[in-house]
Amino acid sequence: MLDNEKQLEQDIESFLISPAGGWQKATDAGYRATAELALDLGTLVRFVKATQPIQWQRFEKQCNSDPEVKFYRAFENAVENDGLISVLRHGFKHRGIEFRVCYFKPESTLNDAAVKHYSQNICQCIRQWHYSGQNNNSVDMMLA
C-alpha cells in the first residue's frame, strides 16, 4: 500500500509540474526558514518584486530597514483586517501603495498586461511539507 501511495503522489506531482500543469516543483525550505509566519515570505516578496517593481521600490524607500519583514507585517495586518479572501481577490494598500498577491485568469486574452500578470503567479507543488519545528511530521503534498 505504501508503494501505491508514493506512486500516486509522484504521478500527481509529475502532472502538476509538467507544462500542462503549470506548477513549479518546490521544497518547504522557505516555510521552514520562516516557520513562525506560516508563509514562504521569500516567494511572496519575489512575486511582488517581479510583478510590481515600481510599488516595491516605493515601499523600500519608505522603509528604513528590513523591507521584507515590514511587508510581511503589512500583509498580515491586511489579512487580519480584511480577511484572506479579500486580500487575495483585491490586494491591499499600505501607506498609499497598492499591492497584489496574486492575479486571476483574465476572461480574454485581449489585455496583454492581464495575461502577463496571470502568467507570473507562482504556484508551487511541495512534497513532504513539514508543518512543525518540534518534530518531523509532514503533509505528503501541499499546493501553494
Question: What is each residue range found by the language model?
Answer:
Residues 1-144:
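An alpha-helical interface "stripe"
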